[in-house]
Amino acid sequence: MSASKDLCVFYLHGFKSSPASSKAVMIGQWLAEKGVAYECPALDISPLIALDQIETLIDERLAEGFSPRLIGSSLGGFYATWFMEQHPAKDQMRAALLNPACWPSRDLAGQVGTHKAWHSDEILAFRDTYLQDLKAMEVGLSHPERYLVVAAQGDELLDWKDMVARYPGAQHLVIPGSDHGLSDFPDHWPAISDFLLR
């Protein structure tokens, strides 16, 4: 078991989101109260660049002696899954996935084009080649017990049943109602933190 002071939590935001999301800010505040290290990078819309950003941060924190804990929201959950299965230090990791995007190469096919970011005036260009990159990032699960999947039945963008089916053997927290952004997130943080901070 790791002491919480030896952990670093990485929050990986979703499509068009940012470190300014309400969940990212709340998690940062809660972890600061516990003295737990926290990273919340502003991920590029390019999947390959986003992976490089995340990998750089994880490797830096590993070199400092931290064990990574991942929280991935929506598309960030897909990225977290890739690291949980592909990173050389995956045996040190655990991940909580919040309404994770299971098959983004399919689900984001209609999003090719330009978009305004959620929390700024930045214009994001999502290219069709990114769908191929996402398809290539699909991985199987080697240790599903290291995942907690939080799936809201009221998710208006993604099907919660896909989330449960994608992660057999994981711990599942299925929430009646709620929504894609988990507007009731504070209610579920105790269970998430109990899973991650050990």
Where are these regions (language model features)?
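Short, flexible hinge/linker loops that cap or flank conserved catalytic cores
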Residues: 1-4, 141
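Structural motif
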Residues: 8, 67-69, 94
